[in-house]
């Protein structure tokens, strides 16, 4: 296919969890000269495959995903690191004469890529230690941020301690909220970006799809996967990796803090909340092409290709 005439093209494939984003991305490789980049804050971790629903070994062998399996679960990975890494990968793919195709459901990462990060104060060890201690008080960080910066609070889950701590840290160090600092940002990407989002047919369908995925996850040995992490000894449930949905709930089950049934129900509840959060992001997202879900990836791919063809592409 021919590239867009002026700027290099980048494709975003977004959507709530369990809507077939990865399958669509793989299918598009039949029609477009694309390279895939994962945009998922859970898929970055090695040894966390079942609970994150990573593409199969066969799919990854035939359709490699960049920014996948790049961190050990004990390591942190900031939005700034993602921004740096993804821009590097995008430029490398463009130099190969191909189109970068970003696929995943981490809406905050997409937002960082599109709008950038303001020049933010570096982390302060003493302040961070204080905020970490306060994180043990139920909802303290979230309530505090809601008073200081309600816009940022609306975009951060109340249990996402890493982002809550960073947002509060920025305010205490700079005297300005994260939202205020972002408004001063003149960041703009030098690409022609086509954004697509798979939209589920209805809430009931998505809820059923999520429950089926979690049942499959447990059948595939998710408990054993978390047990291996649990027995390492260097991991704990306040790490970003173990706070990933499913892992935290299974971790607490292994600590005898809830029953198997409670663990299962909590994973379902947390996953449904995530999907709702993702859909809220997408509802207010600008310049997005929404495509209705279809069980056949080829039909979804055709919808993507139709949009591209209308914008001076020849496929």
Curated annotation (Swiss-Prot):
Its cofactor is Mg(2+). GO terms for molecular function: ATP binding; tRNA dimethylallyltransferase activity. It comes from the Bacteria. Residues 40-43, 162-166 are annotated as: Interaction with substrate tRNA. Its EC number is 2.5.1.75. Keywords: ATP-binding, Magnesium, Nucleotide-binding, Transferase, tRNA processing. The keyword Transferase applies. ATP binds at residues 15-22. Substrate binds at residues 17-22. One of its GO terms (biological process) is tRNA modification. It catalyses: adenosine(37) in tRNA + dimethylallyl diphosphate = N(6)-dimethylallyladenosine(37) in tRNA + diphosphate. The record marks 106, 128 as: Interaction with substrate tRNA. Pfam families: IPPT. SUPFAM superfamilies: P-loop containing nucleoside triphosphate hydrolases. InterPro entries: Dimethylallyltransferase, IPT, P-loop_NTPase. HAMAP family: IPP_trans. Catalyzes the transfer of a dimethylallyl group onto the adenine at position 37 in tRNAs that read codons beginning with uridine, leading to the formation of N6-(dimethylallyl)adenosine (i(6)A). Monomer. Belongs to the IPP transferase family. This is tRNA dimethylallyltransferase. It comes from Buchnera aphidicola subsp. Acyrthosiphon pisum (strain APS) (Acyrthosiphon pisum symbiotic bacterium).
